[in-house]
């Protein structure tokens, strides 16, 4: 009973948050034939601007620069507006026989007002997959790639093997 009362009190005291930054995608696929790739950022809710910073990292997340440039890498996003980040390839060093994975990070920092007291503002960071798809690969092959993935079990360890040139996301998996 005490637990139920505590949960009810917490639920009643929590105020919903209707403001923030939203992105129009959960991943970006950059086709080699395209001039660039883009993602749209939307600021909604409160009348508060955001400072938005974006950058790319390679799949190993080491300090090696990604062969792309993001424009703009840093900008002010006003309340209730939409902005587009463009990703452009600047190097020919990418493999042409398989997809390549990079991480697109987008950090949004809300503006603070000196007149506001006792208010917590939280910066958010979204990390999305940027998948480089060379011209030799097509979307139809990507949807068939999951059929070629094999799984092997060694006790408590399940290992998946992807022999395809495609990056595969696993949303759900069932093991019998």
Indicate where each model-derived feature is located.
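Sec-dependent signal peptide recognition
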Residues: 2-10
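N-terminal signal peptide c-region/cleavage motif recognized by signal peptidases
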Residues: 14-16
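Beta-sheet-dominated interaction scaffolds and their linkers
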Residues: 19-42, 140-153
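Asparagine-centered strand-capping/turn motif at beta-strand->loop junctions
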Residues: 41-46, 156-164
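Solvent-exposed coil/turn segments that connect beta secondary-structure elements
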Residues: 44, 57-59, 82, 88-92, ...
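Short acidic, flexible loop segments centered on an aromatic residue
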Residues: 45-62, 164-176
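Intrinsically disordered, low-complexity Pro/Gly/Ser/Thr-rich segments with frequent PxxP/GP/PP motifs
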Residues: 62-94, 176
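Terminal connector regions
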Residues: 92-137, 141
């Amino acid at each position: 009973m005490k637990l139920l009362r505590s949960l009810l009190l917490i639920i009643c005291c929590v105020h919903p948050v209707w403001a923030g930054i939203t992105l129009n995608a959960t991943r970006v696929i950059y086709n080699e034939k395209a001039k660039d790739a883009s993602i749209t950022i939307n600021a909604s809710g409160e009348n508060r601007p955001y400072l938005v910073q974006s950058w790319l990292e390679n799949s190993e997340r080491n300090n090696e620069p990604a062969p792309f440039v993001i424009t703009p890498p840093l900008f002010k996003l006003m309340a209730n507006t939409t902005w587009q980040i463009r990703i452009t390839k600047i190097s020919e060093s990418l493999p042409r026989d398989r997809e390549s994975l990079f991480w697109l990070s987008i950090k949004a920092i809300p503006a603070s007002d000196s007149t506001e007291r006792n208010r917590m503002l939280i910066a958010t960071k979204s990390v999305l997959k940027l998948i480089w798809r060379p011209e030799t690969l097509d979307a139809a092959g990507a949807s068939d790639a999951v059929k070629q993935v094999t799984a092997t079990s060694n006790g408590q360890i399940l290992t998946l093997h992807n022999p395809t040139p495609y990056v595969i996301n696993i949303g759900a998996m069932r093991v019998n």
